[in-house]
Amino acid sequence: YSVKPGQTFKKPAGSLTVTQIINATITKLGKADLPKALNISEKMPKDIVDNTPTKYNPETEALDYWESLEGMRVEVTKPKVTGPQYKGDIYVLPGDYKGQKLNNIGGVNLRPGVQNTEVLPITVGNKFVAKAKDYFNENITGVVTYKNKTYKIDPIDPNALKGLLQDGGLKREVSKIYPSEDKLTIASYNIENFSANNKGHDETPEEKVDKIANSFIKEVHSPDIITLIEVQDNNGGVNDGTVDGVKSGEKLAQRIKSLGGPDYKYTEIAPVDGKDGGKPGANIRVAYLYNPKRVTLIGKEKGGSEEAARFVNGHLEKNPARIDPKSVHFEKVRKSLAAEFEFKGERIVVIANHLKSKLGDD
């Protein structure tokens, strides 16, 4: 788009303004210690976001409170982490805050009509690893800013945060369902943008492959059938028209076997390039791992990318098959995948889903 003299451009709606100083001239008048950072624990308004949009009430309304602190140094007392890092931020609760109780896994429960405005985002970067129940053993000082439609705190010394973080002891849950000769076990597992590509920016690191494979064996006890969510094509986010993801699925299956798990088989139907949403070029899809010593995938012919599943005489005509892939309800989203298996002489149809889960999903 060419810009012409006299044209006016406005900032897109939906974000608040941030105070800026433009073309400033700085004059040094002397030296002084920085003022003490404001400890925010006691004065944070609880639950109310903005009940009176036309009035400024920082004492009672969270939006106005954070606006009053924009650009200021603040201190958070020994923050408690309420969940893992997400898009470079972790969400914390001040360690001395009395107005909110954490649940048994260190998170904050959603309640009707309550916004949990006392949970604070702190900028830590995309490589920072933390989990619920972890905590910092010292106070964190930072500057309040506004980014991506939310107020957050930028730490004064972000490099020091890793050394202050303490393990809260939260362990990944282990399934209480164990294999049984006469019972079929099925699991659904989001493997989070998994591909056979282990090089470059769009890689799936080998450590991640090991972690997921071990999870299948030790935490969910090697289910007979696994519906996989977010299997990428063979080269991940490389946007070159590749849609086949068999190498991605088989890499995971082979790693499970090498670590002592079952010799799973993999099946999928590749999507049409760029039609199922997710990361551009990665073509995520749902797929299946199944243990051929326990179940049989019925039939030999599978459906096509744009071919709808048909149930004929009590069975899938093609197997596996995508459910109504041309429907307007499945535009730019993962198509559900049906698969028919036989277990102990009985047939069962399993449907793998990965539906939209957030407003920003494409």
Protein language model regions, located:
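Extended non-catalytic accessory segments flanking core domains
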Residues: 1-199, 203-222, 316-329, 333-335
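Solvent-exposed loop/turn segments at secondary-structure junctions
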Residues: 3-8, 81, 191-196, 231-235, ...
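A short local loop/turn or secondary-structure capping micro-motif enriched for an aromatic residue
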Residues: 161-163, 306-308, 357-360
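Active-site surface patch of divalent metal-dependent phosphodiester/phosphate bond hydrolases
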Residues: 213-322, 326-327
